């Protein structure tokens, strides 16, 4: 995760880029080559970039209620920083110092943590940037090709300011479109699968446990993947309200619908990730690792592969959530999570 000595530097940089590309293009480049209606649409789209960006910065991601108590038959996650229980899919944000409902990641470019409540605003910002900069990039490509075709004409026929800005803005707009586009695709794909970036990392960790026969393949299935459109609507709300600056996600960020892999044959909810063990803050862990697995209807020898006690401890330490890295070298802390939960 990118970090800055002053976190607001991460906000100032996009502001400079957005202002420079949108303002100078609207004043010096586009008026000479597009209709007034097209220019007006570009200005409106640029305004929506600013509006969605400001909202993504100031709207909090959502935190659990102070009086939250876990259901008796559900998983019990406890935050040592907040000294309180928290709902499933909730993590403690190191930057904000609070637990965040359905936390996705901490974004240095908004200086805000993306969670259940502000995910639609964050996604709206990405989409408006992609559309606005994508349009500008196409227009710049057309303009540069025309300038190349007319390169033999006298220089006094060209507006030098426009030519210089077009040449500079072409690679700049491509860079913005490429980088933001990759992030948009990543977030959208996760959204389609009903998963957050943190949970995607978690799935990679669980898959490594399956390969080492530390976790059974059945228990590795992700329980929150319901159906394509249900997943999308749960994350960003109705497609009719998504384009509105105040559009909200579905649900409360505390309880979530699960697929069949999230329940036992008797209909009891299963914990995910599967190596989670409940914790009692008043005493000691409610169960040790094996007892916790049995409580969830699993046989420890099946889950832990029948390895010896010493090797089991070494394997367990290596695959702990605060130690493990994926193939890209990312740790849980790289998503802005302060690992204080048990």
From Swiss-Prot:
Enzyme Commission number(s) from the entry: 2.3.1.225
GO cellular component, one term: endoplasmic reticulum membrane
Topological region Lumenal: 30-38, 146-162
Active site feature: 107
GO biological process: protein targeting to membrane
Pfam family, one: DHHC
Chief localisation class: endoplasmic reticulum
Membrane-crossing residue ranges in chain numbering: 9-29, 39-59, 125-145, 163-183
GO MF, one example: protein-cysteine S-palmitoyltransferase activity
Membrane topology, as annotated: Multi-pass membrane protein
Domain notes per entry: The DHHC domain is required for palmitoyltransferase activity.
Family indicated by similarity: Belongs to the DHHC palmitoyltransferase family. PFA4 subfamily.
Primary role: Mediates the reversible addition of palmitate to target proteins, thereby regulating their membrane association and biological function.
Protein name per UniProt: Palmitoyltransferase PFA4
